[in-house]
Amino acid sequence: MATKTSKSTDDLGMTTALGTLLRPLNSEYGKVAPGWGTATLMGVFMALFAVFLVIILEIYNSSVILDDVQMSWQSLAK
C-alpha cells in the first residue's frame, strides 16, 4: 500500500487558546442553508457598488460636470 492512514490521537496537533476562541466560527462549516438565502441581497449590494464605481469613474474622467469643483491637486492644497 502506497499510503498509510493513521487514526491515532497523537496526530491531532497542538491545542491553542486562539484555536479554542476561533472554533465557534468554524462550527457551521459544510452546512448549506436551503434556498437562495441572502443571494438576492448580495446581488443588490453588488449592483449598488457597481453604480458607485461608475460614478467615481465618471467624476475622475470629468464626464460629469461639477460646478465649482476643481479637479487638480493644487485646489486641494488651498
From Swiss-Prot:
Disulfide bonds: none
Keyword Magnesium: no
GO molecular function term, any single one: phosphate ion binding
Topology class, membrane: Single-pass membrane protein
TM region positions: 39-59
GO cellular component: chloroplast thylakoid membrane; photosystem II
Location in or out of the cell: Plastid, Chloroplast thylakoid membrane
Listed InterPro entries: PSII_PsbH, PSII_PsbH_sf
Chief location category: plastid
Chain positions with Phosphothreonine modification: 3
GO BP terms, alphabetized: photosynthesis; protein stabilization
Keywords of this entry: Chloroplast, Membrane, Phosphoprotein, Photosynthesis, Photosystem II, Plastid, Thylakoid, Transmembrane, Transmembrane helix
Keyword Repeat: no
Record note on modification: Phosphorylation is a light-dependent reaction catalyzed by a membrane-bound kinase; phosphorylation occurs on Thr residue(s) in the N-terminus of the protein.
Entry function: One of the components of the core complex of photosystem II (PSII), required for its stability and/or assembly. PSII is a light-driven water:plastoquinone oxidoreductase that uses light energy to abstract electrons from H(2)O, generating O(2) and a proton gradient subsequently used for ATP formation. It consists of a core antenna complex that captures photons, and an electron transfer chain that converts photonic excitation into a charge separation.
Family per similarity comment: Belongs to the PsbH family.
Record's subunit section: PSII is composed of 1 copy each of membrane proteins PsbA, PsbB, PsbC, PsbD, PsbE, PsbF, PsbH, PsbI, PsbJ, PsbK, PsbL, PsbM, PsbT, PsbX, PsbY, PsbZ, Psb30/Ycf12, at least 3 peripheral proteins of the oxygen-evolving complex and a large number of cofactors. It forms dimeric complexes.
Protein name: Photosystem II reaction center protein H
